[in-house]
UniProtKB/Swiss-Prot annotation:
GO terms for molecular function: ribose-5-phosphate isomerase activity. The keyword DNA-binding does not apply. It comes from the Eukaryota. PANTHER family: RIBOSE-5-PHOSPHATE ISOMERASE (PTHR11934:SF0). GO terms for biological process: D-ribose metabolic process; pentose-phosphate shunt, non-oxidative branch. The modification Phosphoserine is found at S60. This is Ribose-5-phosphate isomerase. It catalyses: aldehydo-D-ribose 5-phosphate = D-ribulose 5-phosphate. NCBIfam families: PRK00702.1, rpiA. Belongs to the ribose 5-phosphate isomerase family. It is an enzyme of class 5 (isomerase).
């Protein structure tokens, strides 16, 4: 990036530390897809170590991380155990021949890696575009370290700047109407029940629940909103991940990876 050392570190006004890592030039992939790959591989190189229990996130970006994990397992004979956050993540783990486990057998996770729909300047996240937000939050919350990988389109100053599909809220099916009314009455905006694409009716999560997408109309104090929504009867969890991410790796359009971290 202009004005920044190739491997230099700087800080933003919010105290988030940034590092820029230059990677090989783009392939024939789209820039966004190549950026996902670069971010995923950078996170795996920097954080995955032998004898770890890993939390494996969901979505399109995590595929590249799992591919690199599998390569390193074969090349370095790493002993790793993987905990999935969704049916998709479970299938990825099996597809690449990694060791599958669960929180019953491995309740303490060394490292969780996952994507995000949007990341703000304080490393707060919107997640759940793929409908796996509750499992993702459980795994991230039980990990010693939570690392996020994303492409350049997910980087925002404020939540909602780039992501316009709203904050997902997982709800018990019988409660979706009263939850929708309560959220909009308290916080404004519009709520939609997420509908399925290849089946009639709503999306049903791996937990058998519905997803509401809350399209908020202003910036809120997200830590307070997150708690308030979770207290509404019938809400399972929200797609707001507040103060959970330790580092975020953004794959950039120019083939570099921008790493941001919060001081702890």
């Amino acid at each position: 990036l202009p004005g920044r050392s190739q491997f230099g570190a700087g800080s933003t006004s919010t105290g988030v530390r940034e590092t820029n890592i230059v990677c090989p030039g783009p392939s024939a992939m789209s820039k966004a897809e190549e950026a996902k790959k670069l971010a995923g591989r950078a996170a795996v190189e920097n954080h995955v170590r032998n004898n770890q229990v890993l939390g494996i996130g969901s979505g399109s970006t995590i595929v590249h991380a799992v591919q690199r994990i599998a390569e390193r397992v074969e090349q370095e004979n790493l002993k790793l155990v993987c905990i999935p956050t969704s049916f998709q993540a479970r299938q990825l783990i099996l597809q690449y021949g990694l060791t599958l486990s669960d929180l019953d057998r491995h309740p303490e996770i060394d490292l969780a890696i996952d994507g995000a729909d949007e990341v703000d300047a304080d490393l707060n996240l919107i997640k759940g575009g793929g409908g796996c937000l509750t499992q993702e939050k459980i795994v991230a919350g039980n990990a010693s370290r939570f690392i996020v990988i994303a492409d350049f389109r997910k980087d925002s100053k404020n939540l909602g700047d780039q992501w316009h599909k709203g904050i997902p809220i997982e709800v018990i099916p019988m409660a979706y109407v009263p939850v929708s009314r309560t959220v909009t009455q308290k916080f404004g905006g519009v709520i939609e029940l997420r509908m399925a694409v290849n089946k009639a009716g709503p999306v049903v999560t791996d937990n058998g629940n519905f997803i509401l997408d809350w399209k908020f109309d202003r910036v809120h104090k997200w830590s307070e909103v997150n708690i308030a929504i979770k207290m509404i009867p019938g809400v399972v969890d929200t797609g707001l991940f507040i103060n959970m991410a330790e580092r975020v790796y953004f794959g950039m359009q120019d083939g570099s990876v921008n790493m941001r971290e919060k001081p702890f």
